[in-house]
């Protein structure tokens, strides 16, 4: 189910009311496999390949728009359930449990996220960063006269691909300065 404002929006271009009241839910099939291997008493490796296939995704007909990329407060056009989406990737986790005051966690995701809008063309989604790497590491020391207090030092590092965007259509935006910026839908994300 999409946010409620999607279903009750009035069309900006036609003036019709509640143009999306008959919109159906987005549907999906999920596949995931988890492989966990204990490398030692305190070290765990986990690998999780996955695939998600979305269908009946609301899109604007003959446009690259899809609710899968939605960030706007509301959509002002009629939507149809003709879009698709797919997310394929693998998550890898290496976790060193707290041992002798030391721990770390490394997670990596490599993925591809695509959607098919009302234009029938497969595009990258706005969120197709392709990779994310997180590292967390820490050390703890017992301190105090009775060694009942903990002093810890921790660090976190994140590296990820950039968020995608559609480029501005300069000519169209300048031709209508009284309207908001217009984007080049033929080069979506």
Residue ranges and their predicted role:
Residues 182-189:
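Short, intrinsically disordered, charge-balanced linker/junction segments flanking boundaries
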Residues 27, 31-35, 90:
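Hydrophobic faces of transmembrane alpha-helices in multi-pass small-molecule transporters and flippases
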């Amino acid at each position: 189910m999409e946010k409620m404002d999607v279903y009750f929006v009035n069309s900006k271009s036609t003036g019709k009311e509640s143009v999306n009241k008959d919109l159906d839910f987005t549907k999906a099939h999920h596949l995931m496999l988890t492989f966990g291997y204990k490398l030692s008493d305190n070290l765990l490796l986990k690998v999780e390949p996955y695939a998600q296939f979305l269908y009946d995704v609301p899109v604007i007909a003959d446009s690259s728009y899809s609710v899968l990329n939605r960030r706007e407060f509301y959509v002002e056009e009629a939507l149809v359930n003709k879009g698709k989406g797919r997310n394929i990737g693998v998550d890898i986790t290496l976790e060193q449990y707290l041992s002798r005051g030391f721990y770390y966690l490394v997670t990596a995701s490599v993925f591809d996220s695509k959607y098919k809008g009302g234009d029938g063309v497969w595009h990258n989604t706005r969120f197709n960063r392709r990779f994310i790497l997180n590292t967390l590491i820490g050390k703890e020391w017992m301190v105090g006269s009775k060694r009942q207090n903990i002093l810890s030092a921790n660090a976190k590092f994140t590296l990820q691909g950039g968020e995608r965007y559609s480029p501005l259509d300069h000519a169209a935006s300048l031709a209508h300065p009284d309207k908001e910026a217009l984007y080049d839908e033929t080069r979506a994300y």
